[in-house]
Amino acid sequence: MTSTTSEPAKLQPSSYIPLMFALLTAVFAFQLNASMLSPALATMEDELGATTAQIGLTQTAFFTAAALFSLFLPRWGDLIGRRKVLVGMMGVAALGCVASAVAPNVAVLLIGRIIQGVAGPTVPLCLIMLRQQVLNEQQYALLLGIVTSVNGGIAGVDALAGGWLAGNFGYRSVFWTMAVLCAIAVVAVQVFTKESTATETPRMDWAGVLPLAVALGCVLTAFNEAGKLAEANWFLVIILLLIGAAGFWAFWNVEKKVADPLVPVAYLKQRRTWALLSTTLLTMTGVFAVMNGLIPNLGQDADAGAGISASTISWVTLTPYALAGLVFGPIAGWMASKLGYRYVLQTGLVGTVAGLIISIFMVGVPNAWTLLFVSIFLGVTYAGIANIMLNGLGIVLSPADNQGYLPGMNAGAFNLGAGLSFAVLFAVSGSFEHGYRAGMIAGFIILLAALALSFLIPRPESIDDTVAAVNARK
């Protein structure tokens, strides 16, 4: 595609600073809901008199709800107003935080966490809203890198803050902190962002939403159950997977018949959809449980690993990993504006594959320094490059007439890949004598498949119905 139209002018700081403040506040609010609670789980067990399994279920409920809401809320924003939907998400999430903060028992806490899951598609919706107000491609790529890197980068810091709050004021203070930030986000988004919708705004395809949500919910639950390995109810896993397959089949058939589908079948058949979603799914499956499970576990293993204490391991692995992604994300965005999103994605994937090769050899000499090196390396290549580009491609590949479907489904692929990663890599790890190395080798093989699939993702500049292409013709 070529165009003689000049590049749109960059926004001035007086325009993009308030916009970024609003969007980053919303991203902060969501990320606190997702990760700030992690170090407070033991405190919650004590204060509520609950079991580890019961508290774990509330976490699973939050992430499952976040995945399901991500499927359709971005598209609903296309139709009724993106700012309206984001403000509503933050408001409802604040109510969920309050419900969790005052919960007298685990049952009420579970309901509160499900309500908080409404904030699930915050990042893709923020990126779509950013796309509407920042028309200059280079400036958009840089700001996209900032938004997405902040989303992952604060995960290592807010967990520390959550642990401090829970230790000094009880776990309920963590939820009150979340509620306050959600309330601030409501005001900031309403005041500092502009409302936008798709050019055409037909009725929402709720008939398509239902089977898709059932399908993804069943598959996610099946993977969570499978992740229990020896304790898993495998009959339940099979039933859930069958229901999930039936749900996807029903969704496909509904989309072929309705006048205004959630996702037109023509889009589902295009490489921008299935190649991107497959790459996201395989990338997450290959790396997520390595960085969030195998490497921290290896670090704490007194026999086969480094024997680092539970209170210290995050400082050696997850925190530097997240901070490396935070620092490098904006650089990746700038690189994408110069070299192209797909090329930078593949650079990140090659680097992540290299990081897993290093990790495989590192298993033989585990110590704090090797763990720190691998964590920073993967923080740059995956969290700072590949993850940023996968999120960005979901935005820049979307057709101008349906900007919400691909980011929403991509968010579902991220969540599905995270669940599948723990189920597959931990199953492999538990099946071999040298379990840590076996799990990492499995992740390495899956990442190679993701890299191969990434070559099927079309370059955004080769598609003539994206927002950038439409703007270029104006």
Q: What is the meaning of each model-derived region?
A:
Residues 67-104:
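Conserved MFS/SLC helix-loop-helix module at the cytosolic interface between two early adjacent transmembrane helices
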Residues 60-74, 124-128, 319-331:
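Central cavity-lining transmembrane alpha-helices of secondary-active solute carriers
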